[in-house]
Design a protein with these regions (language model features):
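N-terminal cap/lid segment of alpha/beta-hydrolase-fold proteins
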Residues: 1-25
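Short beta-strand element of the alpha/beta-hydrolase
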Residues: 28-36
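Active-site glycine-rich loops that stabilize anionic/oxyanionic intermediates
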Residues: 35-39, 239-240
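Conserved alpha/beta-hydrolase
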Residues: 43-72
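Alpha/beta-hydrolase active-site loop
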Residues: 77-96
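Alpha/beta-hydrolase-fold enzymes
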Residues: 111-198
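Short beta-strand/loop motif that positions the catalytic acidic residue
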Residues: 235-237
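Catalytic active-site module of serine/aspartate enzymes centered on a nucleophile-bearing elbow/loop
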Residues: 258-300
Length: 300
């Protein structure tokens, strides 16, 4: 399996770290992994290698404000999620070129905004650890974060605001061992996340506001209707993931996708699994279900 790593200078001269794993067999398609908030692409090494062994080329990149070799003053901040998906599109175009292979994304809210913005560019969507924001829940959160941004400044990383977010995610976990327990029921993964200097950092008020805003935006039927209706969607989550409202939010989001006219929507929910379901205990079974879904739609 060949691997290529490089930096791509995007439209506004920001450098984006990119890694590509090429399969050793005839490629079934290209899978682009979008990492989550306050983490980085290297955490997905094992998953990328496994996907390559199953016949897919795999792209990863670090979103602006994230990664290893970046200006520390930028860590945990970006102004606009639309610029972030613009970066991802430039990465995809650079690697994909004119190759006529299916293009599939694994991600969460950034992936959801991407497929809304470039509906005809994407052939498949895998949402892991995502959630559904109804108006009654999402709008007050967005308004509060918008106010905090105005009071403290968009680039400010406010400790108590970040703490408030993690506390809300940990409220059902007893006993609580660490502030990162909500991400996984696997203590080893939690400890690795905490020890990683490039994960778990505080993020800016603007990044939190943008995340909440677009979580709400991409949960609305009118915005989902613009998606490519032929694009199959797989939602993967744990019943103990607070972001997915302990399974209920995932099922609601799937129903909205179906109501919008998406032809193939599947939900894989797993008992006793938390937010980072792909890194959970016994994740081999979860990965196997993922490979089966991919093979159903994408063949050589």
């Amino acid at each position: 399996m060949a691997e290529k790593q490089f930096k791509l200078t995007v439209q506004d001269n920001t450098n984006i770290e990119v890694k590509v794993n090429f399969t050793d067999v005839d490629s079934k398609g290209i899978i682009h992994i979008f990492h989550g908030m306050a983490e980085h692409m290297e955490r997905y090494d094992k998953l990328a290698h496994a996907l390559s062994k199953h016949g897919f080329d795999v792209i990863r990149h670090n979103h602006r404000g994230h990664g290893i070799n970046i200006d520390e003053s930028t860590r945990g901040h970006y102004d606009d999620m639309k610029r972030v998906i613009g970066d991802a599109f430039e990465v995809a175009q650079t690697v994909r070129g004119n190759v006529d292979k299916p293009y599939i994304i694994i991600g969460s809210v950034i992936a959801r905004l991407f497929v809304e913005t470039y509906p005809q560019y994407v052939d498949g969507l895998i949402l892991s650890g995502t959630g559904m924001y109804p108006l009654w829940k999402g709008l007050p959160t967005v308004k509060v974060l918008q106010l905090i941004t105005k009071i403290y400044g968009s680039e400010k990383r406010v400790e108590w605001v970040n703490q408030l977010v993690s506390n809300s995610f940990n409220k059902k976990i007893r006993p609580l061992r660490t502030q990162s327990d909500w991400i996984s029921s696997n203590p080893t993964e939690v400890d690795n996340f905490i020890k990683d200097p490039y994960s778990g950092f505080n993020v800016s008020n603007q990044l939190l506001y943008q995340t909440a805003y677009y979580m709400l935006h991409t949960s609305q039927l009118k915005n989902i209707k613009v998606l490519n209706h032929a694009m199959p969607i797989l939602l993967v989550s744990g019943y103990d993931d607070p972001l997915g409202d302990y399974g209920k939010g995932i099922l609601k989001l799937a129903n909205i996708y179906r109501k919008a006219g998406i032809k193939n929507v599947k939900v894989n929910l797993y008992h006793h699994k938390r937010h980072e379901v792909l890194f959970e205990k016994d994740h081999d079974k979860i990965w196997e279900d993922l490979f089966k879904w991919l093979n159903q739609f994408y063949k050589k």
